[in-house]
């Protein structure tokens, strides 16, 4: 893959329309979540990120890395953009406990249920379903898990839950489509980072970036990457001369996002 310095040099010499200096210093974090309904939010500090995302989330970890290092112009970043990949369904599995509060905040409205003695996953989910009712645009289902689904795919929405409700997101939007939707709302950013480390998804994002006035930084924990293998993302992008993408190999890339 191309060296980052080479990528910046190419952009400076080949562009017919100059990119603002500010945009070089602003990264985009693209991730799959339901913490807010708009496509993007801009943050000025990791403290602001922490108000929306838990410290264990991928978004927070990536933002902490970004705010903790210099940007491509050699100065601390002034801000970063977090972009949302559309999620159309979230399944919550309760951690069963007696006399415990469970809460779901759906489109800004909190709903709670407190379990009784002899609680089960079914009684907790039943209680939450009763508390939530039938909100507009959302289908509420499930027996031992709470399933929240948008009635129209692609509808913007937000949902978060207490830590004792473990959520799994279901997304059908492709990463390239998510990137284009984010860029249509906010294009001030210059460098993309994304939480996915699936080779096919990284390659698709790289292909999309190649047609944009942006760059893409990725990382991989693929054991093939530092070898002469031909299945890793580095080999694939080198083969197609993906000049707007650079990569980092690390055995802990999936949790530390070194890019």
Range-by-range predicted roles:
Residues 1-91, 96:
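Extended assembly-interface regions of large multimeric machines
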Residues 45-46, 78-79, 151, 155, ...:
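Subunit-assembly interface segments of extracellular/virion macromolecular structures
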Residues 98, 102-108, 164-176, 246-248, ...:
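Bacterial flagellar/type III secretion structural subunits and associated motility module proteins
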Residues 38, 45-53, 94-160:
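Extended, beta-strand-rich, solvent-exposed assembly scaffolds of outer structural proteins
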Residues 77, 130, 183-259:
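A glycine- and small-residue-enriched flexible loop/hinge signal that marks low-structured segments
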Residues 94, 117-119, 169-179:
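Surface-exposed ligand/attachment interfaces on beta-rich extracellular proteins
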Residues 18, 34-39, 110-112, 149, ...:
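Short, surface-exposed beta-strand/loop "edge" segments at domain boundaries and coil↔beta transitions
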Residues 82-89, 151-153, 166-171:
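Short domain-boundary/entry signatures in modular proteins, especially
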């Amino acid at each position: 893959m191309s060296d980052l310095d080479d990528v910046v040099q190419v952009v400076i010499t080949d562009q017919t329309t100059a990119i603002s200096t500010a945009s070089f210093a602003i990264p985009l974090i693209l991730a799959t979540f339901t913490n807010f309904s708009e496509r993007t939010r801009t943050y000025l500090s990791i403290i602001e990120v922490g108000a929306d995302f838990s410290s264990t989330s991928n978004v927070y970890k990536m933002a902490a890395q970004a705010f903790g290092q210099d940007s491509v112009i050699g100065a601390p970043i002034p801000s970063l953009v977090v972009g949302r990949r559309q999620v159309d369904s979230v399944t919550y599995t309760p951690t069963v406990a007696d006399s415990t509060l469970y809460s779901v905040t759906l489109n800004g409205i909190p709903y709670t249920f407190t379990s009784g003695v002899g609680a089960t996953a079914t009684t907790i989910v039943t209680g939450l379903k009763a508390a939530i009712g039938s909100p507009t645009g959302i289908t509420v289902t499930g027996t031992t898990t709470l399933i929240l689904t948008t009635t129209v795919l692609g509808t913007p929405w937000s949902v978060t839950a207490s830590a004792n409700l473990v959520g799994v997101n279901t997304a059908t939007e492709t990463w390239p489509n998510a990137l284009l939707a984010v860029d249509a709302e906010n294009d001030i950013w210059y460098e993309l980072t994304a939480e996915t480390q699936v080779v096919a998804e990284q390659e698709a994002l790289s292909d999309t970036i190649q047609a944009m006035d942006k760059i893409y930084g990725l990382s991989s924990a693929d054991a093939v990457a530092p070898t002469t293998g031909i299945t890793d993302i580095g080999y694939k992008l080198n083969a197609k001369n993906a000049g707007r993408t650079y990569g980092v190999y690390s055995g802990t890339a999936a949790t530390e996002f070194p890019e």
